[in-house]
Amino acid sequence: MKYNKKILKNGLTVITSEMPSFESATALVMVGAGSRYENKKNNGISHFLEHMAFKGTKSRPTFMEVAGVVDGIGGEFNAFTNKEYTGYYIKAGKNNIEISLDLLSDMLQNPLLDAVEIEKEKGVIIEEINLYEDTPMRKIADIYESLLYGDTPLGWDIAGEKDIIRSITRKDFVSYFDSLYSSSNMTVVLAGGIEREAAEKLVEKYFVNMKPFKTPKPPKIKENQKVPKTLVRHKKTEQAHLALGVRTVPLDSPERYPLFVLASLLGGGMSSRLFSEVREKRGLAYYVKAASDQYTDAGSLVITAGVDPKRAEEAVEVIISELKNLTSGKKKIKAPELKKAKEMIKGHMVLELEDSRSVSIFYATQTVLREEVLNPDQVLKKIDRVTERDVMKVAKKYLSDKTLNLAMIGDFKDKKKFERLLKL
């Protein structure tokens, strides 16, 4: 699944990925504008702006007119906000790609940002925040990253805080939009049943008037953790949720591939080490999984689990014991286990990329965040090349007491009982 890259005169990057057997096509616009570009006064505005983009343009002044365009072609449209980017996409029949580009370009060049709609949408955003607060399985990731990155934009919640959301004005939106929504800070990806040259001409037609300008860079993370840290959020829940992890590497590090395999080996499937020990052997958790996450200047290997609150300490002990068993060599990585961990990653990736939307996100995130853009085959080969020695090297290097972090949500008032467990 190859791609073509073209940069227009206004600095806009265009990626096309032809998938000849597909009857559908996705048009995605990704902007290098996420919550880590915010400050204390406008935290949450990246996500809020994503909502407002659908609320009307100069030529389509209402949400119903915007939505009607997509409904009229039987498509789906949505958007998503990350800490480092925001994406807007429409997926529809391949013959409707021009309609998709027309609408997306209109939304991102001519948003009304109507003051009345802003006030109305504040209620929606606040209820979304409430939803996250009442969903501890999701909220635990936010708490974990606040522990890792502290009082910095990378440590703040993407949705923001309610009081800040209530205070945001139209002027704030215009200022934020005008500082980051530049053609030179944008990537358009077209994936699916498209023809490259025709698709590139359509992008140029609808985005040619966008202006390039220099955009600000977010503050870099300075990591100097030397002791383990714990953060416990007290909440009366039937199930406790934990995130236990260590600091690792940023997005461009070659070590990220061994870390992907390490995460897969530990908690990538139902036969993984942690699933076997924590759930199957001891019945401590409903879910337990591991992931390796990266930003442009930071990264983390994190294990998450939903556990019986009365046995939460035992669950943490078992997880840490498994990490020790790995780094000490007590439980060696054998060839079949390594192969299975790699095949798990590869299989999930292949299945995910059967969808043109996933393909568009795959290329867009790389283009916005990285110097190098790889196609799926290149990524799969990098996973294949990971050896047992590579995995053990990153395990011993990063699974350390000094950068160990534990976040928990549950009916706990004393974090000291968990702090004493954080020894690798």
Regions found by a protein language model. Give the residues of each.
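M16/MPP (pitrilysin/insulinase) zinc-metallopeptidase core fold and M16-derived inactive scaffolds
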Residues: 26-91, 268-284, 295
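Phosphate/diphosphate-binding glycine-rich loops and adjacent basic-rich segments that engage nucleotide
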Residues: 227-238, 245, 254
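A conserved active-site cap/scaffold subdomain adjacent to cofactor or substrate pockets
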Residues: 251-252, 256-270, 274
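A short acidic-to-branched-hydrophobic micro-motif
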Residues: 27-31, 104, 240-242
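Short clusters of small/polar residues that mark proteolytic maturation junctions
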Residues: 18-19, 53
